[in-house]
Amino acid sequence: MYGAGVVTRMNEAERFHMTDPGSTKILIYAFNYADRMLEEVPYLRYSAERSLCFLGDLRDPGTRLVVITSEAVDPATLDYHLRDVFRFDEPALADVRRRLTLLTPASRAARPLDSLVLEDEALVETLRRAVAERPAGTIVDFSASPATDELGRRTGATPEEGDHAFVARWGSKSGGKEICLRAGVAVPGGTSEVLRSEAEVVEAIHRLSCGTAAARRAMVKLDAITWAASIGNVLIDRDKLRHTGDLVGSAEVIRLPAEEFRRELAEQGAIVEEFLEEITDSPSGLGHIERDGTVRVVACHDQVLSGGQYWGCRFPADERWRPEITDAVRRTGEVLSGLGHRGAFGVDFVVAGERGLLAVEINLRKVGPSHVVRYAEALVGARVGADGMLRGADGRPVYYTHGRLLEPETLGKLNPRTAVERLRAEGLLYRHDTGEGVALHVLGALNACGFVELTALARSPEAADGYSRAAQALLTGPYPSA
C-alpha cells in the first residue's frame, strides 16, 4: 500500500546498503553476454565503471573496496566520484584512498571481465590476500557466472548474485515465464516450453495462431541468459510462415546470421510468444532478495527503448502502473525467494492496449537502472520509499531521467575531466545544495568510444528532462576553447 509521502532517510550504514562492518568487497561488473555482443558493442568494455556507484561504501571505516575494471579508471573519474558524487571531505580522503584498490586484468580480450580475472593468477592471488585481511569477503557482481562462482571459491569471497546454475535455469526466457505464471503475473500468449528445432518452433507458432493470441506476428526468443538486449529475438511473419514453412525466411527481424541462430536453437533452445502490437509503455521493476529471503522492491522505472533495446529510463514509473508493477515485482520475488534466489532481480513489462500490464522478461541479475537508482539515492541521501518515490530532505519528490549517449564524432574528443568541468562551468553538474543537476557515468568510454551515460535529477519530470537535454547539447555541440 502506498504511503503518504514519508521521506525515507538513511543513516550512514543504511545509506550505502552496508551490512558487513569489517569486510572486503570485490566490485566486478562482468557482462556475461554472447561473444558477438562483447565484440560488436565496444562501450560494454567500459561499463564495468558502473560499479563505482558502490564507492560510498567506503564511509564505513571497516570496509575495503577492490574495484576491477577492463581498463584503468581515469584519475579524474575517480576524483569526480569521491568529491562530487559521494562528497568525501579532505580529512577523509587519505583514509578512503588507502582502503580503495583499483585493478585491471592483464588480458585485453573481448571476453567477460570475470573470465579474464580468473585467468590472471597474480590478480587472483591479490584478491585472495585482500579477502583474507578482513572477517568477510563479498564479490559485488553484475550477474552470476561460472567464472564468478570459481573466483569466489578461489578467493574465499561470496558472490552477491548467487549461484550460476540456478540463474541459468530460472533466469532463462523459459524459466522467467514459468516464474511469472507461478506468481500469477500476466504474460503474453505462448508457453514456457523449450523448443530445440525449427520444426518444433514452426509447430508452436501454428498452435499460437489457433489460440486466442491471433496476432499477425510471433516472437521467437533464444532461451539462454547470454542473449540480452533483444539480440536473440526473432520476429516472425505468421502469414509468410504459413505459406512457406521456412522459419528463418519468414523473419521480419533477425539480428543473428541464420546459421548462428540455428546452432543456438539446437544447443540452447528457444520459446515462442505472441508479438504484442499495441505497446504504449515499457516500464520495469527492480527488486532485491536479502540473505534471509526477504523481498524488497527497490524502484520502478519507465524504460526508454531504442530498437527494442534498453537505452535509458525515467523515474518514477507512471503512477497509473506503479502500484501494479510493485505488486507484481513483490509476488515474483516471493516465488524466486522460495526457490532459493538471493540478490538482485528485474522484471520488464509492457503496457499492451486493453490488456494492460504484461511481464515480458525476468532478469536474475542487476539491470540497466540498478546503478542509476544507487547513484540517485546517494546524491539525494535517501532511499526510494514505500510509496515508490524518492524524496529530498524537504520531503519534496525527486525525479530523474537517465540516458546513454553514443556520439563518437563529438564525445570521442572529450576526456572525463573536460566533460565534468564543462557541465560544472555551465551550472549543469549536480549540485547538492539545490538537489538538481546532472551526474555522469562510464566516463572512461568517452575517448575510446564516444559513449557516456548521464542522469539528470530535478524536482519535476519536466525540469529533469530539461537538464538532460541541455547536458547532451553541451557535451555533443560546439564549445569555445579556453
Swiss-Prot record:
Keywords: Amino-acid biosynthesis, Antibiotic biosynthesis, ATP-binding, Ligase, Nucleotide-binding, Plasmid. It is an enzyme of class 6 (ligase). Pathway: Amino-acid metabolism; Antibiotic biosynthesis. SUPFAM superfamilies: Glutathione synthetase ATP-binding domain-like. One of its GO terms (biological process) is antibiotic biosynthetic process. GO terms for molecular function: ATP binding; L-propargylglycine--L-glutamate ligase activity; metal ion binding. Gene3D superfamilies: ATP-grasp fold, B domain. Disruption phenotype: Cells lacking this gene produce lowered levels of both L-propargylglycine and L-beta-ethynylserine, that are terminal alkyne-containing amino acids produced by wild-type S.cattleya. Involved in the biosynthesis of terminal alkyne-containing amino acids such as L-beta-ethynylserine, that are produced as antibiotics by S.cattleya. Catalyzes the ATP-dependent ligation of L-propargylglycine to L-glutamate to form the dipeptide L-gamma-glutamyl-L-propargylglycine. Is selective for L-propargylglycine over norvaline, allylglycine and the standard proteinogenic amino acids, except L-cysteine which can be used as a substrate to a lesser extent. NCBIfam families: PAGG_GluLig_BesA. This is L-propargylglycine--L-glutamate ligase. The gene is besA.
